[in-house]
């Protein structure tokens, strides 16, 4: 979203090149290594919800972040019209993320005024974590470029629906590209494997 600009995600290290243990990517990589030792791969998809405002970040700061103007004026969950009314922003998010090789599946209105959701296609856990960071950076900066504002806060308004971040998790075999969760055991109408049962509840 900025011409002639590169955004680099990297791992912090000591002067000797040792990864910083408490860095989020180091922590996640350690967990991935533990999973891979079991011949498994963790696959993740992300759904992030956020509120959009026609108030700029500067204007919001000047009013102590009160009385912000929602990008939508009614609850738009699955409503056809409101999607077009915020396409200037959501469309830009999708385009810029796609240009950065972050595959967006969809955007949609949610159950709060100006609330939306952006879904990213699943990938391996570390790549998804990086995509998650890029998504939030993109949404905030592109909103700012358009005189708008966005927040991923869980509950910015007590009178509106809250925002969440849904993560879809599955375990795959390292030997072949198979999701190990489907199986023969029925739970609540789903046919699942023992791997899924252990993953879900430890039983």
PLM features per residue range, with description:
Residues 1-203:
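Glycine-rich, acidic/polar active-site loops that bind/position phosphate-bearing ligands
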């Amino acid at each position: 979203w900025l011409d002639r600009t590169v955004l680099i995600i990297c791992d912090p290290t000591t002067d000797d090149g040792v990864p910083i243990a408490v860095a989020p990517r180091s922590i996640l990589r350690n967990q991935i290594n533990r999973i891979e030792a079991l011949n498994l791969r963790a696959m993740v998809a992300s759904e992030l919800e956020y509120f959009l405002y026609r108030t700029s970040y500067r204007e919001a700061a000047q009013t102590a972040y009160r009385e912000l103007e929602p990008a939508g004026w009614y609850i738009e969950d699955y409503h056809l019209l409101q999607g077009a009314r915020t396409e200037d922003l959501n469309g830009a998010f999708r385009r810029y993320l796609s240009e950065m090789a972050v595959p967006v599946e969809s955007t949609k209105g949610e159950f709060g005024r100006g609330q939306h959701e952006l879904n990213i296609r699943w990938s391996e856990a570390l790549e998804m974590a990086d995509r998650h960071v890029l998504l939030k950076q993109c949404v905030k900066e592109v909103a700012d470029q358009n005189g708008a504002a966005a927040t991923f806060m869980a509950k910015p308004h007590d009178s509106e629906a809250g925002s969440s971040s849904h993560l879809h998790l599955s375990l795959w075999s390292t030997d072949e590209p198979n999701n190990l969760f489907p199986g023969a055991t029925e739970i609540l109408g789903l046919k699942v494997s023992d791997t899924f049962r252990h993953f879900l509840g430890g039983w």
